[in-house]
Amino acid sequence: MFGIWDLKPKIKMTSTCVECPVKGCSQSVERQHDHFRREERYYCPDHKIYISPSTFEYANEEDNLLWKSKPDLDLLKAIKTVKRESRIARDNSEDALTWNIFRFLEITNQLGGLLSWLTQMEHAQTELIYWSYSQKTKEAWS
């Protein structure tokens, strides 16, 4: 995962090309228009990302995740059975942000404490529902 310090403050682009957003990279790719596409002509082979004028997407979505042990990836795979779409591989992905923060709170058993602090009520037991997926029932939550 690239951090803010790994990226150029501004990327150069023309009507036909966009440069790779990673500092020190001189690769340029064809400029995407309209819809984001994962095609070779938009790919930086040095950094394994697909580039558009406004975002980039990792070729491997795991590269955008902080929590990617086998149990984490198994859970993510199960979640995708009920989740309609995923943009978790995009650099500015709300899905990746949600996963990285809430998975941390869940793994470190801090979710109940955070909820108790936010609501000023005790929350001894919590169940985190990721995108309508219940880990308890292993299906869409209802």
Which residues fall in each region the model found?
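Charged, terminal alpha-helix-loop-beta segments
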Residues: M1-S142
